[in-house]
């Protein structure tokens, strides 16, 4: 960043501080990951200069012959990765991918069945503070109070009762596998479209470690970061018959020019995900997640559902008399980054919460294995049991520094 350092030291210094934070902290936010240097290189390329409204071969501007190559690469790799007939890689985010799908088949006021936010859903699955909850009549399904897992009989009952035009499956804080085939059965029974938001598990799906929703869903949306380990962005997958309508929903429906430098980075990330090494990485994610859950529970920390089938798990802090807000703050002070998170049947506000969400995708990218992640579990447990013990917290902070130094991040930057 020699040019930036010379011309705008304030921005340069802030970026260097963030690099230092990422290197020094144990990153456990489930929606974050560390992209490769080549993904970052593509994002910082001259493609950021090019406006390219429309789609390859059908642009509203001239000079798009080379960015067309890039977008075609991204689309083809995405289709190969997930076995899809159609891919749109232009959505700027997962939220906009979801919006485009809604815009394609729903009218304002239509009924949609989605997962309760505090039970693990997402803002765009019908939260009243989000466009989805404002424009459409969302009704909710959730998890069982005893198991904290989705009960498909309850989902079916809700679908039969409300007769939604669409059912949304997928979650932002659900640690167990989701049965998309079962959702398809329920959707067919009530004549509903099925949209699956696989943003959190897309990498695991690509690696064959979670049921692929693409054969079952009418529409599959995802982000391109998280477990897929690409740049921040969105994507839509569907059958070829939806190409014209979905393309129109993205442009000119809800977006203007695509971000060609980000699409290039998506293409690079998809190329990485097609390699055998990516499957090995995702297998390690699962092992690390299970080991972390096991370690936390062995140290008297409550893990919802008793474990995890994916990259994340939810910690219930109520037995410890703690809030997510307090735990997040103190963990961050010792160099462990998590986020406060509501848990099913929450009694606290979303700004306080009774839980924290932890994910292992980023630390697994960094090279953490089961031995390292067991140490992380012990460190988290010590903090949660000693939230006001300065001596213990100082010791944990020192051990965090030792651990992160063993796994260098971006040494060439």
Curated annotation (Swiss-Prot):
Q: Which GO terms describe its biological process?
A: glycine biosynthetic process from serine; tetrahydrofolate interconversion; tetrahydrofolate metabolic process
Q: Which residues carry this modification: N6-(pyridoxal phosphate)lysine?
A: 226
Q: Which residues cross the membrane?
A: none
What is the first-listed, main subcellular location in coarse terms? cytoplasm
EC number assigned by the record: 2.1.2.1
Keywords, in A-Z order: Amino-acid biosynthesis, Cytoplasm, One-carbon metabolism, Pyridoxal phosphate, Transferase
The UniProt similarity line reads: Belongs to the SHMT family.
Q: Please give the subunit comment from the record.
A: Homodimer.
The identity of this protein, by name, is Serine hydroxymethyltransferase
């Amino acid at each position: 960043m020699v040019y930036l350092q010379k011309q705008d030291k304030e921005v340069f210094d802030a970026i260097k501080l963030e690099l230092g934070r990422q290197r020094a902290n144990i990153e456990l936010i489930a929606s974050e990951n560390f992209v490769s240097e080549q993904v970052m290189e593509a994002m910082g390329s001259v493609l950021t200069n090019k406006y390219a409204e429309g789609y390859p071969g059908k642009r509203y501007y001239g000079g798009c012959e080379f960015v067309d190559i890039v977008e075609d690469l991204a689309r083809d790799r995405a289709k190969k990765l997930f076995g899809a007939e159609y891919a749109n890689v232009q959505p700027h985010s997962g939220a906009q991918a979801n919006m485009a799908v809604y815009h394609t088949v729903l009218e304002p006021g239509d009924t949609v069945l989605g997962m309760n936010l505090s039970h693990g859903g997402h803002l765009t699955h019908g939260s009243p503070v989000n466009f989805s909850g404002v424009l459409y009549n969302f009704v909710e399904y959730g998890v069982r109070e005893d198991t904290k897992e989705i009960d498909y009989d309850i989902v079916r009952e809700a679908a039969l009762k409300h007769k939604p035009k669409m059912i949304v499956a997928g979650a932002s804080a659900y640690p167990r596998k989701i049965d998309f085939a079962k959702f398809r059965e329920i959707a067919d029974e009530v004549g509903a479209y099925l949209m699956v938001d696989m943003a959190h598990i897309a990498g695991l799906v690509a690696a064959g470690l979670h049921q692929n929703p693409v054969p079952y869903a009418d529409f599959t949306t995802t982000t391109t970061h998280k477990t897929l380990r690409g740049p921040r962005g969105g994507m839509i997958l569907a059958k070829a018959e939806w190409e014209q309508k979905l393309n129109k929903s993205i442009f000119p429906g809800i977006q203007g020019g695509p971000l060609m430098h980000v699409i290039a980075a998506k293409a690079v990330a998809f190329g990485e995900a097609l390699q055998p090494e990516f499957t090995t990485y995702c297998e390690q994610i699962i092992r690390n997640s299970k080991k972390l859950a096991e370690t936390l529970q062995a140290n008297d920390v409550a893990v919802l559902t008793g474990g995890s089938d994916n990259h994340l798990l939810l910690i219930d802090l109520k037995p410890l008399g703690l809030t997510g807000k307090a735990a997040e703050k103190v963990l961050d002070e010792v160099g462990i980054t998590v986020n406060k998170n509501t848990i099913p049947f929450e009694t606290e506000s979303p700004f306080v919460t009774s839980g924290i969400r932890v994910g292992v995708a980023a630390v697994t990218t960094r090279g953490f294995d089961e031995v390292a992640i067991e140490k992380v579990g012990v460190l988290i447990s010590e903090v949660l049991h000693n939230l006001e013990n300065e001596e213990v917290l100082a010791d944990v902070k020192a051990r965090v520094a030792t651990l992160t130094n063993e796994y260098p991040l971006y040494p060439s930057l």
